[in-house]
């Protein structure tokens, strides 16, 4: 669970987040809804420590207990990120890495696994998002946009996160593929009891995915 309490954030004197409060629950797809420019992305970035808030609290129920993001050091924020998966508007894959190597990247950065365990975990995550094995060794440019998004989801869950942040996850996808991605995010959220936060202005996606 994440508790946002009375959060304030301004840029150059312009208030973007004005005493925002909300609870984001485990095992559910929690929606941040609003038109473009309403502050959705600012709130999400504030919740993962990419923006420093001007006031209020953002409290995570981490594996080590409750932690207030507002009082964390830079090192503590990095430690928190080990429990956070992130899915960006674009798939944001590394063009120079294969599909499997992209999923292994967070494991290389943050885990103490052996090389064999990293490969096994990456392949498990790719299978979980229904990627065909023949695609594991392909480059991102060799697969479709929908498949790229699947790879991005596999990478986001590689570290077995407690929290999954999705910024416009259906951006650039056709309606049919969007439904598939929505269902995949829902299934993973419930299966692993993840606290998932989705930022969207797409009403069709909101009705399909949100709890």
Predicted regions: what is each one?
Residues 48:
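Helix-to-loop junction immediately C-terminal to a conserved catalytic motif
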Residues 57-79:
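ABC ATPase NBD Q-loop/coupling interface
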Residues 116-134:
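Conserved ABC ATPase "signature" region
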Residues 139-143, 147:
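Conserved ABC ATPase signature
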Residues 160:
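Conserved catalytic motifs of ABC-family nucleotide-binding domains
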Residues 164-167:
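Catalytic Walker B motif of ABC-type/P-loop ATPase nucleotide-binding domains
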Residues 175-177:
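Helix N-cap at the start of a conserved alpha-helix in ABC-type nucleotide-binding domains
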């Amino acid at each position: 669970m994440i508790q946002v309490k009375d959060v304030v954030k301004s840029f150059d004197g312009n208030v973007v987040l004005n005493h925002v409060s909300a609870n984001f629950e485990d095992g559910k797809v929690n929606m941040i809804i609003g038109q473009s420019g309403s502050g959705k992305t600012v709130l999400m970035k504030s919740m993962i420590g990419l923006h420093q808030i001007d006031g209020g609290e953002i409290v995570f129920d981490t594996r080590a207990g409750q932690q207030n993001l507002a009082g964390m050091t830079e090192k503590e924020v990095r430690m928190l990120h080990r429990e956070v998966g992130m899915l960006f508007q674009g798939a944001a894959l590394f063009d120079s890495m294969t599909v499997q190597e992209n999923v292994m990247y967070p494991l290389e950065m943050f885990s103490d696994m052996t090389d064999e365990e990293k490969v096994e975990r990456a392949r498990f995550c790719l299978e979980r998002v229904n990627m065909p094995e023949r695609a594991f060794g392909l480059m991102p440019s060799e697969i479709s946009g929908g498949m790229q998004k699947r790879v991005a989801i596999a990478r986001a869950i590689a570290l077995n996160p407690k929290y999954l942040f999705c910024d416009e996850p259906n951006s650039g996808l056709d309606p049919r593929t969007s439904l598939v991605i929505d269902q995949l995010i829902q299934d993973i959220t419930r299966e692993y009891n993840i606290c998932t936060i989705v930022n969207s202005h797409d009403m069709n996606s909101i009705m399909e995915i949100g709890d």
